[in-house]
Curated annotation (Swiss-Prot):
An MF annotation (GO) of this entry: folic acid binding
High-level lineage: Bacteria, Pseudomonadati, Pseudomonadota, Gammaproteobacteria, Enterobacterales
Gene: ygfZ
Pfam families: GCV_T, YgfZ_barrel
Role, per record: Folate-binding protein involved in regulating the level of ATP-DnaA and in the modification of some tRNAs. It is probably a key factor in regulatory networks that act via tRNA modification, such as initiation of chromosomal replication.
Subcellular location: Cytoplasm
Transmembrane stretches, start-end: none
The protein's name: tRNA-modifying protein YgfZ
Family: Belongs to the tRNA-modifying YgfZ family.
The species this protein was found in: Shigella sonnei (strain Ss046)
Cellular-component GO terms for this entry: cytoplasm
Family annotation (PANTHER family): TRANSFERASE CAF17, MITOCHONDRIAL-RELATED
SUPFAM superfamilies, alphabetized: Aminomethyltransferase beta-barrel domain (SSF101790), Folate-binding domain (SSF103025)
Top-level taxon in the UniProt lineage: Bacteria
Length: 326
């Protein structure tokens, strides 16, 4: 019997979030094992995995030959190989692409649906988990393993934890936190990722963007010093020739409907509106505010006004918790 996801509640912004335990069903886990795992991943993703410590996790992109991302992966070491978390909607096609050259290497690449993905965030999240686990991850040690459980630490938008565990531990955790924590589903974690400026690549946007268009260079997800990987030439050209004119932005405001991944928005130009950008993700918060993650030109004026197409309501730019200055 699979672990049952929690019923949805309207997500809350990080500043007002009570202690919350989330089931992360919209995300999925995959692994690579075998003697050639590190070498294989080094030739496939934008990050320098050979430099990754056991207690580190990072966001890397897996690109096609043109440097466009199939997906981004939250990557960490796992046994003799690696595990990563990505949006469930892109896992199958991403693994198909990743496996294309695997026949020549000693690796096994597979989806993992045995483990349960949970998120813990909100008021005193660390204190709540400290009662359950003997050690918690932190800024200095971002990945901690305990038995069947791996805990990943995130700083933004406020301290939170992603837990990869077995069904028994997931049930135990739920039982222990049920009284003090709100239960919610993937939408709450999605809202936190949007607020943190972590790019969300779902199926609609797979194969559409180079990593820099989603700020991956600002998140430490691209190494410009490592050897060859698929799409490297285009990713390097975007940096060294200034070919990338796009960036990921956070918008907030009102909208009568939520824009979908892949949709464009409209930018106010004097009295008129002009189509712009590509939506990666959007969530409506419990206070009625809509937050939107969108890829647009990187030279937008900070006071620009946007809207969902033909809508009466407007959206404005919110600051991200990191700098895009290189």
């Amino acid at each position: 019997m699979a672990f049952t996801p929690f019923p949805p509640r309207q997500p809350t912004a990080s500043a007002r979030l009570p202690l919350t335990l989330m089931t992360l069903d919209d995300w999925a886990l995959a692994t690579i094992t075998g003697a050639d795992s590190e070498k294989y991943m080094q030739g496939q993703v934008t990050a320098d995995v050979s430099q990754m410590a056991e207690d580190q996790h990072l966001l890397a992109a897996h690109c096609d030959a043109k440097g466009k991302m199939w997906s981004n992966l939250r990557l960490f070491r796992d046994g003799d190989g690696f595990a990563w978390i990505e949006r469930r909607s892109v896992r199958e096609p991403q693994l198909t692409e990743l496996k294309k050259y695997a026949v020549f290497s000693k690796v096994t690449i597979a989806p993992d649906d045995e483990h349960v993905l949970l998120g813990v965030a909100g008021f005193q999240a660390r204190a709540a988990l400290a009662n359950i686990f003997s050690e918690l991850p932190s800024k200095e040690k971002q990945v901690v393993k305990e038995g069947a459980t791996t805990l990943l630490w995130f700083e933004y938008p406020a301290e939170r934890f992603l837990i990869v565990t077995d069904e028994a531990t997931a049930n135990m955790l739920t039982d222990k936190l049920r009284g003090e924590a709100e239960l919610n589903n993937s939408q709450q974690w999605l809202a936190l990722n949007i607020e943190a400026g972590f790019p969300v690549i779902d199926a609609a946007n797979s194969g559409q963007f180079i990593p820099q268009a989603t700020n991956l260079q600002a998140l430490g997800g691209i190494s410009f010093k490592k050897g060859c990987y698929t799409g490297q030439e285009m990713v390097a050209r975007a940096k060294f020739r200034g070919a990338n004119k796009r960036a990921l932005w956070l918008l907030a405001g009102s909208a009568s409907r939520l824009p979908e991944a892949g949709e464009d928005l409209e930018l106010k130009m004097g009295e008129n509106w002009r189509r712009t950008g590509t939506v990666l993700a959007a969530v409506k918060l419990e206070d009625g505010q809509v937050v939107v993650q969108v890829v647009m030109n990187n030279d937008m004026e900070p006071d620009s006004i946007f809207r969902v197409r033909d809508d009466a309501n407007t959206l404005h730019i919110e600051p991200l918790p990191y700098s895009l200055e290189e």
